[in-house]
Amino acid sequence: MTKRELYLFNPDNDLSLASGEVNYMPPATARRMAEELALLPAWYASAGSAVLAPSAYNLAFLREMQECLSLPVELVTEPEVASISNLKPVPWGWNPALKRRLRCLGMPETELPAEPYLEKLRHLSHRSQAVELLPRLQLDESFCGESFYLTQPEEWCRFVESRASCLLKAPLSGSGKGLNWCKGAYTAFIAGWCKRVAALQGGIIAEPVYNKVIDFAMEFFSDGVGKVVFVGYSIFSTNASGAYDGNLLLPDEEIERRLSAYVPKVSFVSL
């Protein structure tokens, strides 16, 4: 039987993956975002697939959008999951809590990731992986940056107090969460924060603070069996604390033009 993809948007994935708990409850803001943006996958889902929404209240908006744009997807509500036999879940991200949620909705175990897969995913999502990869991404003089994975209290203290300013990060976090901005003093608050994060996630990511001029990301797609392809750029904004504020919706050509004001196009294209 041909599987039908069921897309779902779970913006709490980073937080849930960091927790690792099957009963993890996201904060109210994340739950509200997931509910209000439940139909977001309709904009990137493959033709003929379905999008999971909390209830049929989302259907009116989807129908309105389909009158104006080509969005060849259908809505599936949570109560309907158990009655549709050929669904294959395609979430924003996998984590133990989502696996439990889908199982409770009636998704067959064969369509859910095994525990070793989730453990490997958590390991690969850990920022210590980026620390190891960063030096290999610096292809020419246009690139810079350093990042450290520190596991001992004396390392945290030494790093903070040896710089006028620096940034400490929880290894499993996203969207500007799990950040601690330091001003050269290893205070009791910072020490306590580091100890709590390291107890849960193994250590702390420590980085210098740079004179940033623009936030952008390169987006890639992995098919899960070894093939990775570049799918586009993302230019976004953050607030003074580093938390995500929003995105600019621009074609890749325009983003490349803007980035070229700071870095030669040949450099980031080669990356």
Where are these regions (language model features)?
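Phosphate-binding site of ATP-dependent enzymes
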Residues: 190-242
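ATP-dependent carboxylate/phosphate-activation module, predominantly the ATP-grasp catalytic core
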Residues: 220-271
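Well-ordered, non-membrane alpha-helical segments in soluble/globular domains
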Residues: 30-39, 127-132, 187-193, 259-271
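Conserved N-proximal alpha/beta basic substrate-recognition cap immediately N-terminal to
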Residues: 30-44, 51-158
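ATP-grasp fold ATP-binding core
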Residues: 134, 159-181, 200-212
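Glycine-rich phosphate-binding loop of ATP-grasp-fold ATP-dependent ligases
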Residues: 146-147, 166-190, 217, 239-256
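Conserved ATP-binding module of the ATP-grasp superfamily
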Residues: 140-145, 167, 183-211, 270
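N-terminal-proximal low-complexity accessory segments that begin disordered
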Residues: 1-43
